[in-house]
Amino acid sequence: METELMRIGVSLPDTLLSKFDEIIEKRGYSSRSEGIRDAIRSYISYYEWMGDIKGHRVGTVAVIYDHTKRGLSNALADIQHHYSHLIKSSVHIHLDHDNCFEVVVLDGDGEEIKELAEAIMSLKGVKFSKLTTVASNEKI
């Protein structure tokens, strides 16, 4: 159980904070702090799940990014070329003038898939990224 609370400061774009405030109100949180604690717990849980990605996997990485960010499109292409042995397909959609949505379909070693996803997630200009995988040998 968490006992000691630490005060931190966070800088956010106003549109992101407005959306977060809407969610807090709809979910009935008593404060932004409670919403942030819940979001951090969810992030930690997802990160721990990513640590368990082992063996042969199939999955996707979904990414929304600002293609006007200098060097980002090239960095994404470099990552995809480096991990081309894992990539089976990709779909690229222009959302608006600045933003693109890309889904990359993957098949291969789970640890390498995780490396690819983390390389994409760490790039400046990536606004959203989500890795989803399943063990390819599971009986469905």
From Swiss-Prot:
Output the InterPro entries linked to this UniProt entry.
Acetolactate_synth/TF_NikR_C, ACT-like_dom_sf, Arc_rbn_hlx_hlx, CopG, CopG/NikR_regulator, Ni_resp_reg_NikR, Ribbon_hlx_hlx, TF_NikR_Ni-bd_C
Instruction: Indicate which residues the UniProt annotation says bind Ni(2+).
Output: 81, 92, 94, 100
Upper taxonomic lineage: Archaea, Methanobacteriati, Methanobacteriota, Stenosarchaea group, Methanomicrobia
Function of the molecule = Transcriptional regulator.
Q: Which SUPFAM superfamilies match?
A: ACT-like, Ribbon-helix-helix
Which GO terms are recorded in the biological process aspect for this UniProt protein? response to nickel cation
GO molecular function terms noted in the UniProt entry:
DNA binding; DNA-binding transcription factor activity; nickel cation binding
User: Which Pfam families does the entry mention?
Assistant: NikR_C, RHH_1
Q: Does the keyword Transcription regulation apply?
A: yes
Q: Which PANTHER family match?
A: NICKEL-RESPONSIVE REGULATOR
Top-level taxon of the source organism: Archaea
Protein name (record): Putative nickel-responsive regulator 2
